[in-house]
Amino acid sequence: MVRYRMRSPSEGPHQGPGQDHEREEQGQGQGLSPERVEDYGRTHRGHHHHRHRRCSRKRLHRIHKRRRSCRRRRRHSCRHRRRHRRGCRRSRRRRRCRCRKCRRHHH
């Protein structure tokens, strides 16, 4: 304990400028923090806006897919499977389209 007490006054003035240097770094950090916050806010806003655009695009793409009549898809599948026409007919009977147009047509 005595040795530590003897060292502390000798380290005291040495720690002083060290603490001041740390404070300067903290000051610089505080000076940069609002700029970083602004930059982060901009990037975050941009990312959020871009994310919203992606979401809307996905929704529009889904709506566009829904608007397409599945008959086109089925015709394409039938053309693709010309050899297996019977299997395609069975799949047509089993799988009915959920779109309103096909429901109205079937009912």
From Swiss-Prot:
Superkingdom field: Eukaryota
MF terms in GO: cadmium ion binding; DNA binding; zinc ion binding
Localization terms from the record: Nucleus; Chromosome
Modification after translation: Proteolytic processing into mature chains is required for histone eviction during spermatogenesis. Transition proteins (TNP1 and TNP2) are required for processing.
GO BP term, pick one: nucleus organization
Coiled-coil boundaries: none
Function (record text): Protamines substitute for histones in the chromatin of sperm during the haploid phase of spermatogenesis. They compact sperm DNA into a highly condensed, stable and inactive complex.
Protein name: Protamine-2
Organism field: Mus musculus
